[in-house]
Amino acid sequence: MKRKLISPLFLIAALFSSTGQADSLKGYWHYDEFLAEFPEQRPISELFAQTVRDKPSALTVAQEQPVIISVVYPGQQISDYWVRNIKAFEKRMDALGIRYQINQVFTRPNLDTRQQSVSLMEALKNKSDYLIFTLDTTRHRKFIEHVLHSSETKLILQNITTPVKDWQGKQPMMYIGFDHEYGAQLLAQYYQAHAPKKPYSVLYFSEGYISEARGDTFIQDMNAVHHFPLASSYYTKATEQSGYEATLNIVKNNPEIGFIYACATDVALGAAQALKELNRQDILVNGWGGGSAELEALAKGELDVTVMRMNDDTGVAMAEAIKWDLEGKSVPLVYSGDFEVVTKQDSAARIAELKARAFRYSDR
């Protein structure tokens, strides 16, 4: 894959080999691949998934003291995924009757690395029972490896469903999220069915795991049908402004494109704003995640489609994982939540039904 740096954005030449894309998540177990390799995980994963969907059942053991939980999230963005996630987590913990103390820090994705490092070290210093974090960058990975090998704090990794192969034998307590690859495949299927057979462009997140899982997977799937040549791809700063600026460049350099595939909410909304200003709303653009801001943009016709996460399920899953752990039950290594494809043509009734399901705790 040829890459060329253009400040402040990264433009990637549209020369992607299918081999390169197949290796986009090298070093990780793809979710289906993981279940095939470790079939004993499938029944426990299915039981856990049903527990997440079910109404809460109270903790069955007595607690000597509250559990201490530290949460470090990249929550300062337009996407409300992280804020809703922690709200659903707390409400499910309360419903389960678990006594807990929570320390949480929201940072900006791709920016506040120093703040993240300080918060993470404080979590270990305070001897948290559970640390909830994410894995996107090399810095994240190095810290996680430090925790895995030198701390008794149990680690729950959020927003990732592909276990790291190198950690086999010393894995985190659990990976919880929505399978980025599967979401990308759903959007690829939508574009293959509905987009004009023209070149397209990709707006990545910042460099890291999410861009690989969402972006490279999508490109690989589109390459397979041969009707949609990739015109250009940009890494962004994971912000609305960087998505806006990249889209202006895309349309200037490749005015013939039929759609823009965006890898995240903030980036998608920036792209939609640029297309509106350029009067190029003939170019399709998607959201990614289906949070409140995206659903509003879909209703206005500013976005064409999104994959909507059943958002609160991952917050519920974190609470249920802690409950199972306190009760001495075996916890599955991975929980992967459900998606629904939503388009601007969908009825208000369907959107309302999906919102009631996705935000069942966080909208209370």
From Swiss-Prot:
Pfam families: Peripla_BP_4. The keyword Signal applies. GO terms for cellular component: periplasmic space. Residues 1-22 form the signal peptide. Keywords: Periplasm, Signal. It comes from the Bacteria. InterPro entries: Peripla_BP_I, SBP_2_dom. It is found in: Periplasm. GO terms for molecular function: DNA-binding transcription factor activity; transcription cis-regulatory region binding. Disulfide bonds: none annotated. GO terms for biological process: regulation of DNA-templated transcription. Binds to the signaling molecule autoinducer 2 (AI-2), a furanosyl borate diester, (3a-methyl-5,6-dihydrofuro-[2,3d][1,3,2]dioxaborole-2,2,6,6a-tetraol). This complex then interacts with the LuxQ sensor protein. Belongs to the bacterial solute-binding protein 2 family. This is Autoinducer 2-binding periplasmic protein LuxP. It comes from Vibrio cholerae serotype O1 (strain ATCC 39315 / El Tor Inaba N16961). The lineage of its organism: Bacteria, Pseudomonadati, Pseudomonadota, Gammaproteobacteria, Vibrionales.
